[in-house]
Amino acid sequence: MKTPVFAFALLVAAAHADPRRSGFDDMSASTQALQRDDTLNPALLWLKDGEQRFTSLCVRCHQPQAMRGVATRYPAFDSRLKRPVTLGERINLCRTRYLESKAWGAENEEWLGLETFVANASRGLPLAPPADQRLAPFREQGRQLFVQRLGQLDFSCAQCHDQNAGGRLAGSLIPQAHPTGYPIYRLEWQGLGSLQRRLRNCMAGVRAEPFAYGSAEFVALELYLMQRAAGMAIETPAVRP
């Protein structure tokens, strides 16, 4: 028989349970199985390619084991640019600054693979956005974008993913939209894609003109979304419908 103290502790724990849900929690068992089993995960090809690319390009400066935890703290402030940069942009900056190579373009397969490898090193770790005060105005910009109505349908991110999360839109479940698994493999895409690709899809869905890849708006929005998901575990490479 449970003691009153133990029962009270259970009630307190339930009251403080994290209401946030990963998109993984809402997927079918078959799609969850694809993500759980690395040998079945369709993003494996990109992950392996990223590992090879890291070995050939990055080990002169970085050891693979040092990548553990890196993805948990992006976007981060770049002192030279005086603005936040995403993990993908940091990789591209390393490419141009130190390898003196041409920057990869949006959704480049090699770039996605390398970012997947770096982010995968932090799989299972909680997102830990930096407390750097220089990020505060950019994060606030992202919050404002999240609640701003856009497009001909006059919808905001918050309307779908805060107010109506768990409901359905055109037959599809509306997720809470926590960016815990990017780059992700979407079955709809039959390929790997970045968070910005997904955000552009959402904007097109409400009939708004999508921001450009790499835009300040997308970086600010990602900064806010990562703060919103702080403490949730990284899943990269996640699989979604």
Give short role names for the model-derived ranges:
Residues 2-5, 12-46, 75-140, 166, ...:
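Post-cleavage N-terminal segment of exported redox proteins
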Residues 38-65:
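N-terminal, post-signal-peptide region of Sec/Tat-exported proteins
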Residues 50-52, 147-151:
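Short, flexible, mixed-charge glycine/proline-rich loop motifs
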Residues 68-71, 167-170:
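Short Cys/His-rich "knuckle" micro-motifs
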Residues 74-81, 173-181:
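Short cysteine/histidine-rich metal-coordination sites, predominantly Zn2+-binding motifs
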Residues 128-131, 155-158, 170-174:
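Short acidic alpha-helical/loop segments enriched in Asp/Glu that coordinate divalent cations
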Residues 151, 159-165, 177-187, 193, ...:
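C-terminal cap of thioredoxin/glutaredoxin-like
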